[in-house]
Amino acid sequence: MYVVIVYDVGVERVNKVRSFLREYMNWVQNSVFEGELTKAEFLKIKSRLKELIQESSDHIIFYSSRDRKYLGIEDLGTPKADTSNII
């Protein structure tokens, strides 16, 4: 499945969330990650993020699709990094 994760967390937790997500996904811009995940990886990520955040003040949104080709993705400006050749 293809997943996009967007988060707004307290400044004291940003580095922990970003570091964790970098293990599984591509960092495309501040507070946004995307990538191909298995169902097991997706569930593991959701579980770990629940431990890292404070649900009373932080917010994370998960967008998922069977495949990236089903998403209409457009961007403007300079992306953070080229992820087209990452295996």
Curated annotation (Swiss-Prot):
GO terms for biological process: defense response to virus; maintenance of CRISPR repeat elements. CDD domains: Cas2_I_II_III. Its EC number is 3.1.-.-. It is an enzyme of class 3 (hydrolase). Mg(2+) binds at residue 8. One of its GO terms (molecular function) is RNA endonuclease activity. InterPro entries: CRISPR_associated_Cas2, Virulence_VapD/CRISPR_Cas2. Keywords: Antiviral defense, Endonuclease, Hydrolase, Magnesium, Metal-binding, Nuclease. Its cofactor is Mg(2+). Homodimer, forms a heterotetramer with a Cas1 homodimer. Belongs to the CRISPR-associated endoribonuclease Cas2 protein family. HAMAP family: Cas2. CRISPR (clustered regularly interspaced short palindromic repeat), is an adaptive immune system that provides protection against mobile genetic elements (viruses, transposable elements and conjugative plasmids). CRISPR clusters contain sequences complementary to antecedent mobile elements and target invading nucleic acids. CRISPR clusters are transcribed and processed into CRISPR RNA (crRNA). Functions as a ssRNA-specific endoribonuclease. Involved in the integration of spacer DNA into the CRISPR cassette. This is CRISPR-associated endoribonuclease Cas2. It comes from Methanosarcina acetivorans (strain ATCC 35395 / DSM 2834 / JCM 12185 / C2A).
